[in-house]
From Swiss-Prot:
Gene: psaB
Quaternary structure note: The PsaA/B heterodimer binds the P700 chlorophyll special pair and subsequent electron acceptors. PSI consists of a core antenna complex that captures photons, and an electron transfer chain that converts photonic excitation into a charge separation. The eukaryotic PSI reaction center is composed of at least 11 subunits.
Residues engaged in binding chlorophyll a B3: M662, Y670
InterPro entries according to UniProt: PSI_PsaA/B (IPR001280), PSI_PsaA/B_CS (IPR020586), PSI_PsaA/B_sf (IPR036408), PSI_PsaB (IPR006244)
Class in the EC hierarchy, top level: oxidoreductase
Annotated binding of chlorophyll a B1, by residue: H654
Gene Ontology CC: chloroplast thylakoid membrane; photosystem I
Source taxon at top rank: Eukaryota
Main location: plastid
Binding site residues for [4Fe-4S] cluster: C559, C568
EC number(s) reported in the record: 1.97.1.12
KW Cell inner membrane (keyword) present: no
Name of the protein: Photosystem I P700 chlorophyll a apoprotein A2
Amino acid sequence: MELRFPRFSQGLAQDPTTRRIWFGIATAHDFESHDDITEERLYQNIFASHFGQLAIIFLWTSGNLFHVAWQGNFESWIQDPLHVRPIAHAIWDPHFGQPAVEAFTRGGAAGPVNIAYSGVYQWWYTIGLRTNEDLYTGALFLLFLSTLSLIASWLHLQPKWKPSLSWFKNAESRLNHHLSGLFGVSSLAWTGHLVHVAIPASRGEYVRWNNFLDVLPYPQGLGPLLTGQWNLYAQNPDSSNHLFGTAQGAGTAILTLLGGFHPQTQSLWLTDMAHHHLAIAFIFLIAGHMYRTNFGIGHSIKDLLEAHTPPGGRLGRGHKGLYDTINNSIHFQLGLALASLGVITSLVAQHMYSLPPYAFIAQDFTTQAALYTHHQYIAGFIMTGAFAHGAIFFIRDYNPEQNEDNVLARMLDHKEAIISHLSWASLFLGFHTLGLYVHNDVMLAFGTPEKQILIEPIFAQWIQSAHGKTTYGFDILLSSTNGPAFNAGRSLWLPGWLNAVNENSNSLFLTIGPGDFLVHHAIALGLHTTTLILVKGALDARGSKLMPDKKDFGYSFPCDGPGRGGTCDISAWDAFYLAVFWMLNTIGWVTFYWHWKHITLWQGNVSQFNESSTYLMGWLRDYLWLNSSQLINGYNPFGMNSLSVWAWMFLFGHLVWATGFMFLISWRGYWQELIETLAWAHERTPLANLIRWRDKPVALSIVQARLVGLAHFSVGYIFTYAAFLIASTSGKFG
C-alpha cells in the first residue's frame, strides 16, 4: 500500500476524509501518540528538535544583524541616538507611488525603510558594537552557530550519537550542567564581555580581537583581585557628566554599586550591570555543584524530597513520590519550565521600562511601549501553556498509587476548596471594580463628577515610600532620612537610587492615585479569573463529580455524545481555550494602563490620565478613541503619510479578529451542508470538474474549529493593538 500522510499514524492515514490532513497536522508534534513510539525515541526526538529550535533562533537573530548592517543606519544613529531614527531594513514594494516613497523614506535613507522599534540599536550600542563591520561579523558568527545547531540536531538522531534514556533521566547531572554551565559560565562570560569590551567602548576605547590582549580593562589589571583588595575595582566610577561613548567624564571602575541611572543615557550604569552579572555567575557556579552525581558528594534530590515530611502531619506524606512523578513526566517538566519562563518574561516587561538597561532606550518611547507590550503578551501565552501541560500530565502521566497522600494528591483532594475560593475572589473583584467604574461613569454622565467614589491606594503608596519615594509624605524606611535603613546604604548605592526614585523623568515608582487603584483591581480580576479557569481545567482534568471517568476521554474531547448531556465544554482543552480569551482580555487592560499612563507622562499632562481613568467613558474616549484618531486618518484626500501602513494593519487586524467569530459561533452541521453543496457544484462545473481529490471533504471538528477561531481572535486582537500602539506613540513622539 502506498504511504500517505501522516506516516506516524496508520489509522489516520487510512481515513477516507479530509480529517486525515487536519488531524495529521494537529498531532504531528504529539510524539507520544505516534504509532511506533517508545519512551527512548520520544526523548531523542524532543532533544533533536531543541537543536532545530536553536538553529531557527540563531538564523533569525543573524538576519536582524545582517539587515541592519546592510540597509540600516547604525553608524549614523550612534552619532546622535536621540534624533536619528534607527532603520530596521529597507522596503521594496511595487505598489508604492511617489507619495508612498516619500512617506517611508526616513532616517536619512535613500529610499523607503522600516523604522526599528525593537531596541536592538540601543542594545548593540550598549554592549560595545560600533560599526557595520561589527554587525556583519556578529551575523556571520550566528549563522555559523545556526549551522552547527542543525548538524547537532541531525547528529543526535544517528544511532551512534543517540543519548540513552538513562542519560535523559539523570536529573542531578542535568541540573548541575544547566546551573553552572548554562547560567553560571554564560553569566561569567557576559561579565567578561562587559568588562573587556562594553565598558571600554562606553569610555571611547575600541577593543577588538587585534588589541584585546593589550588593553587592560582596569589600570591595575588583576592586581586587586589577587591581593584581595576587591574594593579597588569600584573606585573612580564614571562621573555624572560622563558622555557615553567618549572619555569625557569617564572613570576607571569596572564593578560598582552606584544605583540609579546614568544621567545622559537614562539607563543603568554599565559597571553596576557587570557587577550584577558577576554576582549571578558566582551564585550559579556554586549552585551547579550542589547535586550528587558520580562523585558521591552533594544532595540527592530524591533524598531531599523523601526527607521533607512536614511536622504535625498537616501535609500528609509531604513530597514522597514526587521525584519519580516529575522525572518520568515530560509534561510536568514542561509545565514547570513554562510557568517559570512565563513569570520571567513578564518580569522582563516590567523591568525593561522601569530599570532600562540599554543606553538611550528610555528616551525612545515607541520602543519602550512596543517592548513592554510584546513581553506581556508572550508571557500570557507561555503561562497558559504551563497549565495546559499540567492538565495533560494529570491525564497521561499521573499515577495515584505513586503519589498517595503527598502534596500533589492533596491538591486534587481539596480541589473544590481551591476552585471555589478562586471563584469567590473573582466574583468579589469583578462586581466591586465594575461597580465603582459604573458608578463613576454615571456621575460623570449626570454632570456631578464630585460624587465619584475615588479611593487612594494608600498601601501601595506606603510601599513606594518604604522604597524611598518622598512625594506622599510617609516618613518610613528609605524615605525616612534619619532611619537605620537609610543610613546603612548611604555610602553604597542609596544616593543614586533615591535620586532615580524621586526624579519624575523616569518610570520608577510612578505616582499613583484613584485611577491606578481601579485599574489595578480590574487587572487583578482578569488575573484571578484566568487562573480560575486554568486551575479548574487542570484539577478537573482526570475527572469531576459530573464526569468521573474524564481521563479516559483524553485531553481534548468535545462531548461524550448525547447520552451524557452536559459533558460538552468540560475537557481540559476547553479550559485552556476559554482561559486564552481571559488572558488576552487581562493583558489588554495591562497594556492599555501602561500605555496611557506613559503617554501622559511623556507628554507632561499626567492629569489627563488621573482625571479620565476613573470612569469607563474616560478610557473609551480619552485613551482608545483619542489615540486611534491618527490611525483612522492614515489615508485622506491629501495623500498618505508614514502611519498609513499602521492604519492598514489596524483595519486588517480588525478583519482577522472578526473572522475568528465565524469559526467560534457556528458548528459543524452548517458547514457540512455548505461543503456538500459546493462539492456538488464543483463536480458539475466544466473545466473545474477536471480537478478531483481522493478525500471526502468534511467540516472541521468542534475542537478544531475552536482552535482556528481562537487563533484568528488572538492574532487579530494583537495585530490591532500593535498597530494602534506603534502608530499612536510614534505619531506623537517620532
